[in-house]
């Protein structure tokens, strides 16, 4: 080997050694030199794993436990070409960074958000206060807010006779890091639980690993499947605010316990200290005149029995006024939460089943739900569960309170009285059918549907024309204008008139509209023989596929043919069976609404 060869070999070995020192995720990065300079300046490590690049965690020379909960902030709206070399100087200006996690994409760019954990809680609060809307680039503002480090899981499907200790023991057998189990007693029978529990873990990572392990189909507890999901994290209220609270939250009360009994029990230490008591089912809020009286009552009555039930007493957590105002505004359909095209719950009521048809009740959505839905009613997981994802104060849905008695009349006076408008679903679209009728989705004004809240759910338009036709037929055929072919209208009208005269009695004056969708109910009516005449409705009849679509099919042309074709109802589709066979309307036909 010559001297030149040895020199080349040494230089290649040196290059290989230097490249080996570059951590994974930094090597080959667009700003590799800037990241290496940052690591050299601060002494922090940097590694990429699981789709995120971690800077620090812990910082050099760190001794002690992991930072407490509430030390992490979420950073959003990050330009995709901004990396740690620009973010770290900004965030370390307000406090010592314990760890920064930048979410990365496969192309080497960031995903637009990151998490910054500080060593102390007050530093995180300062970062939110000072760095929110910070201009990281000209015209590009960062969004900084507190990060929710959720360590709590919801577990459903628990046998109702199991006690807290039994549940804790069983969960600790299959998962690690369990700190506590919260079990609520049944309101009706305090000897039973409500069939679910909340499990608190020592860290978010431990909770995430437990959730993955307990997913349905992997592990059975007590011999059957369980339901697992994230629970709503506890509201983190500022300590200074909590120092002013003089309201107690009391739970696990008996249903028959009265407000007077609660007031007497909590006011025994200082007569007159209780201002008022508000009891809701099995929990209550007790308002005191001073914080000292509230703390004294809490310390003495927590864990004691009242009318045979063990009380749980804590200080009530107030709701952030700014957030509450935002939630209320969203619940009313204003502000950032724009009202989607969703059903109006003032739509016609079926007096026989007391159901609002036009939309299923198990999918109540839209800006009006704060009038009709309480917390937990959609998935029924109770206080603190993950059933209702929308943020809001505890005991409310979307930040709103239950309207209570008289809500229906107040609703009609307000949102129910709106100007009716037409809905043109697909402009300039005609759908050919097998009969001489062309169905064209028209601009139709539907009674009792307000201008803002439509009954038709918004859906993205298909890219292909043929897909659009199929999509329209299947999902958006509710308001239709049936336009018969003029060439076949006369023959169809004559045939329909003859068939109608033989089966359906002549009606001189059209009866009032029943206020319900008129559909071919002979296919579902019990003990009613189907009419054998196949052409009773003529060539222009368009059947409805779903009885939940509350719509009137009208003949836009030739009113005389309409009156003859539909047995004198002049535009309304009649019930397709003889009037003497069964009384109409049929109450049990519409139970599926």
Swiss-Prot record:
One of its GO terms (biological process) is 3'-UTR-mediated mRNA stabilization. The keyword Cytoplasm applies. The modification Asymmetric dimethylarginine is found at residues 394, 405. CDD domains: RRM1_RBM47 (cd12485), RRM2_RBM47 (cd12491), RRM3_RBM47 (cd12497). GO terms for molecular function: enzyme binding; enzyme-substrate adaptor activity; mRNA 3'-UTR binding; mRNA binding; RNA binding. Residues 1-25 are annotated as: Disordered. Its main location: nucleus. The keyword RNA-binding applies. It comes from the Eukaryota. GO terms for cellular component: apolipoprotein B mRNA editing enzyme complex; cytoplasm; nucleus. InterPro entries: HnRNP_R/Q_splicing_fac, Nucleotide-bd_a/b_plait_sf, RBD_domain_sf, RBM47_RRM1, RBM47_RRM2, RBM47_RRM3, RRM_dom. Belongs to the RRM RBM47 family. NCBIfam families: hnRNP-R-Q. Homodimer. Interacts with A1CF. Interacts with APOBEC1; form an mRNA editing complex. Interacts with RBPMS. This is RNA-binding protein 47. The lineage of its organism: Eukaryota, Metazoa, Chordata, Craniata, Vertebrata.
